[in-house]
Amino acid sequence: MTDEVQAPALILVVDDVQEIVEELVALLELVDLPAMGAHSLADALAILEAVTSIQVVACDVRLNRESGLEIIQRVANNALLADRPLKYVFMTGDPMRPDAIAAQQKCPVLTKPVQPRELIALLRDLLATGSAVG
């Protein structure tokens, strides 16, 4: 029996569909990208406050009655998070919106269903670069 020390999470996946969060977190863990999941913006902010190792937030655009895009402003307005250099990736099921969202938020947008290789490559690139949005 081996005692594996789990690496601190680097990525926070935010989606209101529990199965999607679980699948993406499991996928990222398989490729050595430690991740955690949240199902709402409130959950995401609480996790970001508690887990300082997170560097990238991968968030669905539509979260029940919330807009996932609001996470950038909520982080900026949070005294504990405002100075944190987080990077963002948004995911949308609306194929007509990715370019508009990317231009408005100045961050990458992936169209659902998200292609695993594309997501993994993008997250690795964001973790490797020093640029952040916010």
What do these predicted regions represent?
Residues 82-96:
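A short, hydrophobic beta-strand element within the central beta-sheet of small alpha/beta folds
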Residues 1-12, 18-25, 77-85, 108, ...:
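Non-catalytic signal-transmission and effector/linker regions of two-component phosphorelay proteins
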Residues 39-40, 67-75:
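Acidic catalytic/metal-coordinating carboxylates
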Residues 60-61:
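Active-site residues of response regulator receiver
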Residues 64:
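The feature encodes the CheY-like receiver
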Residues 32-41, 47:
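Short hydrophobic/Thr-rich beta-strand motif most characteristic of the beta2 strand and flanking loop
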Residues 14-15, 38, 57, 91:
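Conserved sequence signature across two-component system core domains
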Residues 101-110:
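As written
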